[in-house]
């Protein structure tokens, strides 16, 4: 299989695409990454719709999308256009179409772009199981072409562009039966429609591969880019994590998916889907886009590293086990969290540890490993005595100016872990190997940590360690280019079993949230990393950073330490107040560790995304809700005033409820 999906996994270069115009806005080519959003008003409400569009435009949104679910909605588009013209607005509009080709033919007259979902434009979702022969499959494609071609021809005639937007939650039965609920199915779903458009000489196309799970979403976009390379297609990509949710969790998921793909050079326009007021999506999208719009491409090529991943599927990078006391990492153990603390004196140190335990009780998390940041050598005795009162390992990060002399090496034997930079702490390689061997013989382990600029010097070291039988070693990197430098490290270690600790140093919690989600999160979804460690300079941030570490593991679906919510951002199809409903359900169920609950405004993606959730709460009509167990409806048309309680009863029935006092 050809694993190539971008220029290189080890450095930044944006994928070259054709330019697609959406009104006066240009997507792809050499243009900056475009920011867009979607309003959540009813499209028949002219005043409310225009108000939201203008608010988004003022906030910096460059393209606005709205749903057009029916002929009545399409009939109101001229009124919306007229009011926007009066207000002096020139922002391009996108009509979002599901299920209704006839409505698309009306909407295309009044917008700059049409979005169609290949999973439901010409198909109805029945979850039917059927084996298609090749001839039967071809007949289905002919049927789709007959339905889709009129819209393509009208778009071509009017100069209207199109997004072919696949959603993981709404693949057609035809695709599901042939390819399964997979990234490959998502890609092939889009390609079927692209081929039809190309047969009519229409190329003003943008493509998206959205999913609520960032891992699935990233794999699908990579596979799409790889297939584009094979087929010599150069369409721009619209990036987004659908149903990302709200608050920090929604921002983390979005940054993991969107940010890591932008790092790979994939993506020309982005939408951050939050279950919040649409204007709150724009600052997040701008932050992500500006990181790359301002990025300078380094002229030198990256050589000497080879692809060691399958970028289209998740497979954990295998490492040997590290075990000290009750602490276990690597091998098949969950990805662990290490917390960095300063040390002033024993009392303040132990108080900080107690604070972390107390904080963690509310979220079912607790400290797993502690690292003391650059203590002076004369503090080691006091640190050792304080650490003896704890059941978790306490390690020492040696400062840059500390020399690892024989006296210090002896003092460090009291610590299960020492972190050092071989290029700062040792001038003699033989002495370093002797130090590592002595610690291994004593049942201790060591972390070799250096800057990304020196990573080339790691080449050959894993072979040397393996030859002399040193195993109790893990590796980490200090870098602003976390994704690329850790991939380089992974390439160097690919034939060995040394664990990898993912380390990130950031100036403040906001930078930590976004940059760790992009860098560390982007590595975790590829199976790279046995421990994570996030560091900021201020002591007051420790609880927030402690929580962020676990939130990253939650966002990548590697460790669920709280309830996982899959909630859509709301649109004109939504059949209840999604923000209020999501907040209400969170207040009832937020303590259910590891339970996945989907809150969906309507049926467009609802049933499909239920497959990724334990329970679902989906709008079925005004004042009515369907409740799901997995992807199966178990309670239909539940009155909304009792739906929350019925959801709790459903969770209890299936044995996944916990009383708050027991958590």
Curated annotation (Swiss-Prot):
Q: Which residues bind [4Fe-4S] cluster?
A: 568, 571, 602, 609
- Which GO MF terms are attached to this record? 4 iron, 4 sulfur cluster binding; 4-hydroxy-3-methylbut-2-en-1-yl diphosphate synthase activity (ferredoxin); 4-hydroxy-3-methylbut-2-enyl-diphosphate synthase activity (flavodoxin); iron ion binding
Instruction: Report the pathway entry.
Output: Isoprenoid biosynthesis; isopentenyl diphosphate biosynthesis via DXP pathway; isopentenyl diphosphate from 1-deoxy-D-xylulose 5-phosphate: step 5/6
Q: What keywords are assigned to this protein?
A: 4Fe-4S, Iron, Iron-sulfur, Isoprene biosynthesis, Metal-binding, Oxidoreductase
Gene3D superfamilies linked to this entry: Dihydropteroate synthase-like, Sulfite Reductase Hemoprotein, domain 1
Q: One biological process GO term for this chain?
A: isopentenyl diphosphate biosynthetic process, methylerythritol 4-phosphate pathway
* Entry's EC annotation: 1.17.7.3
Regarding protein family, the annotation reads: Belongs to the IspG family.
Give the protein name, as stated in the record. 4-hydroxy-3-methylbut-2-en-1-yl diphosphate synthase (flavodoxin)
